[in-house]
A protein has these predicted regions:
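Residues within well-ordered alpha helices
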Residues: 48-49, 86, 102, 120
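Short, well-structured N-terminal submotif of metal-dependent ribonuclease cores
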Residues: 1-37, 49-58, 116, 134
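Active-site neighborhoods of divalent-metal-dependent phosphate/nucleic-acid chemistry enzymes
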Residues: 69-113
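Active-site-proximal, substrate-binding regions of enzyme catalytic domains
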Residues: 43-71, 82
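Active-site phosphate/pyrophosphate-handling residues
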Residues: 7, 41, 98-101, 116
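Alpha-helix N-cap/helix-start and coil->helix boundary motif
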Residues: 39-43, 80, 117-118
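Acidic, PIN/NYN-like endoribonuclease modules and their adjacent C-terminal/linker elements
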Residues: 1, 92, 100-134
Length: 134
């Protein structure tokens, strides 16, 4: 079981230079979990791609449904005080710290391409490449 952030989900579902790595992460550990926040972040990333004309709106809707199916039953609520403490101590956003808090609470790795999170939380956050090499 691993915590994944919305960026990794976007990399998995939207074909691009990082898709193969995201697919390898899923092959290595298919039990992906995330805080409930992932949905909003994922949708926001998709609409940004739509606005840049990189993904048609219809495709974004399909991708959103596919991601929701993958993550169904694997979404967790994290408590505010943990998230806020992590954000205050690290300088990372509260959004990012939702993923960190979940990973720490469940004692599982957080796989993310967010270098700031990896630097701030080296004991729990791994890049996809480092996760695959471990």
């Amino acid at each position: 079981m691993i915590v994944v952030n919305a960026n990794l989900l976007v990399q998995y579902y939207v074909r691009g230079t990082h898709t193969a790595v995201a697919e390898a992460v899923l092959s290595r550990d298919a039990q992906w979990i995330a805080p409930m926040l992932w949905r909003s972040e994922f949708r926001n990333a998709l609409i940004l791609l739509v606005r840049r004309r990189l993904v048609p709106l219809e495709d974004a809707v399909v991708v959103a449904h596919e991601a929701e199916r993958l993550m169904a039953g694997h979404e967790h609520i994290v408590v505010a005080h943990r998230v806020l403490r992590l954000a205050a101590d690290s300088g990372c956003s509260a959004y990012d710290c939702e993923y960190v808090a979940l990973a720490e609470d469940l004692d599982v790795p957080l796989v993310t391409s967010d270098r700031q999170v990896v630097r701030a939380f080296p004991s729990v956050a791994l890049t996809p490449e480092r996760f695959l090499a471990a």
